[in-house]
Amino acid sequence: MYLLIPAAGVGKRMGCDRNKLLLEVRSQPIIAWTLLAAQAASEISWIGIISQPTDWPDFKSILANLQLTKPVEFILGGSTRQESVYNGLQALPTAAEQVLIHDGARCLATPNLLNSCAQAIRHCSGLIAAVPVKDTIKVVDEDGIIQNTPDRRNLWAAQTPQGFNVELLKQCHAEGVRQGWEVTDDAALFEKCGIEVQIVEGEETNLKVTTPQDLAIAEFILNSRDNS
């Protein structure tokens, strides 16, 4: 299975002016933990890191330390996640029929989750890892006034990996460019094009490291795995 890792973001909410994936959790950069999970996932055979060239020297140094056995390629990132993934799709080997897309900042996803998504995408056109929402969600207007309360039983929190048929996803991205759609994940492009996206049960610990608090939580989770 082919894996694309969007890794081009700057950690503004992290309070830093460089790529947040270079910040460390337990003496390893965030991106290193993501790559180690991909290395350990038996279904993953190829990894594409979508990032800015200014980060490539640091990423290459990390790769040298990790000594991964799977092929890794660097792909030029865009100005948005959507544009970055589009670039990643164009860089896939021609043999790629399905692809997984996994946020570099979701460094706690386990090899088992990557494998489950890789196996499931062979039997559908699109999928996302997701978990049921536990909190009650309120829809509010621009003045902060509650408008309605959706039924929590129908709400799932989207995660990554997200998996897709490569040709269909390329078509959806092309349509998104034509229509001027701006989306925050690839499943939304499938939805806008009327293509079904299935759910694969995600992991409660599969958080996206975005804030300093997330760094502390990630360290706690990694420590707990060592002690289990």
From Swiss-Prot:
Q: Which domain of life is it from?
A: Bacteria
Q: Which SUPFAM superfamilies match?
A: Nucleotide-diphospho-sugar transferases
Q: What class of enzyme is it?
A: transferase
Listed Pfam families: IspD (PF01128)
**EC identifiers of the protein:** 2.7.7.60
- Look up the record and name the pathway of this protein: Isoprenoid biosynthesis; isopentenyl diphosphate biosynthesis via DXP pathway; isopentenyl diphosphate from 1-deoxy-D-xylulose 5-phosphate: step 2/6
What positions are marked as the site Transition state stabilizer? 13, 20
Keyword entries, A-Z: Isoprene biosynthesis, Nucleotidyltransferase, Transferase
In this chain's numbering, which residues are marked as the site (Positions MEP for the nucleophilic attack)? 152, 208
Which PROSITE patterns does the record associate with it?
A: ISPD
Q: Where are the transmembrane segments?
A: none
GO BP annotations listed: isopentenyl diphosphate biosynthetic process, methylerythritol 4-phosphate pathway
What GO molecular function annotations does the UniProt record carry, in alphabetical order?
2-C-methyl-D-erythritol 4-phosphate cytidylyltransferase activity
Tell me the protein family, please. Answer: Belongs to the IspD/TarI cytidylyltransferase family. IspD subfamily.
Protein role? Catalyzes the formation of 4-diphosphocytidyl-2-C-methyl-D-erythritol from CTP and 2-C-methyl-D-erythritol 4-phosphate (MEP).
| Protein name per UniProt | 2-C-methyl-D-erythritol 4-phosphate cytidylyltransferase
Q: Per the UniProt entry, what species is this protein from, by scientific name? A: Nostoc sp. (strain PCC 7120 / SAG 25.82 / UTEX 2576)
Taxonomic lineage is:
Bacteria, Bacillati, Cyanobacteriota, Cyanophyceae, Nostocales
